[in-house]
Amino acid sequence: TTIFNAATKGSVDVAGYSSKLNVGVAKVPDERLTVLANMYKPRRVVPAEVTYTDLPPPPEGFGQTRGISGEYLNAIQSVDALLIVVRAFANSSVSHVDETIDPIRDAENMLMEMTFSDIGLLDRRLARIQEGLKKVKVQDRGDVQREQDLLLRIKEALNSGVALRDQQLASDEIRRISGFGFLSIKPLIAIMNIGEEQLEESEALEKQL
């Protein structure tokens, strides 16, 4: 939420945990736009915008390989990229859902839950394909069979711990699965939230993450 406020010039309360989802918009400064505006004198200048969605802390039981579901899943599926913030600072006045501070565990839990959600999506899609193949003529099965082969290959890699973003997929394969709502295919940045007393060890902490 602190990063959300900084990016959107917002003032969302960061003192405690909230189940509320926050959405904010930030304009993207671009000197090129200013140059063009001075040249062509348009009636209106509209800079690019980035919409940020600040999700609440993971729900209770998160990290127990259940996969992400419900509103939490819908919110993550709706964004183009992910920024995961994990806590490394110690402060007894700020509670943690798991009661202990372990940023590596928290990051791994999030990645694991995204993977399990993707596997769940794959299983449901593969089941529909298998059922559909029974109704399709042999000569018409080519495209459906190719999709099945692709999804099985993706699932095998996910089960081996390889996120979709790290799998070697052709551009046409990426287009084929673009509407499925997979989470582990999204670009991802991980940020570790440290305390002032940890500044000297920030590089070592970054390497761990």
Where are these regions (language model features)?
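C-terminal-of-GTPase-core extension/linker across diverse P-loop GTPases
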Residues: T1-F4, R128-L209
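Preference for short coil/turn "hinge" residues that link or interrupt alpha-helices
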Residues: S19-L21, P103, A107, A157, ...
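Conserved G1/Walker A P-loop phosphate-binding module
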Residues: T1-S95, P103-I104, R124, I129-G132, ...
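Conserved beta-strand/loop subsegment of P-loop NTPase cores
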Residues: T51-T53, D80-R87, P103-A127, L150-D166, ...
